[in-house]
């Protein structure tokens, strides 16, 4: 697997801008819609767990787990964008991820932020 397969985040969404900042340079917030989130929980695969355990003994990247986490984050972000779009937003401000263990059987990834309507400053 190449490093490109573990790229950071989703590609741009043409109708919903997602940023980690409070505002967008050159734009003004015309409406704050509120919190939106995208959530997914992935179960842990026994084979991956065994492989990860062995790999952790000798060191190095756990590529299978890295790939799963990238896919999981992408799915959570896509759900966040879908929710923002459904509520009439064209932007999500203060975007963040939260990752937690889910009852020792999986991993929960939550993408969250503030849905808003922005427009170019005139």
How should these model regions be labeled?
Residues 1-48, 107-122:
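N-terminal presequence-like segments and the immediate start of the first folded domain
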Residues 36, 41, 49-96:
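Short, well-ordered alpha-helical segments
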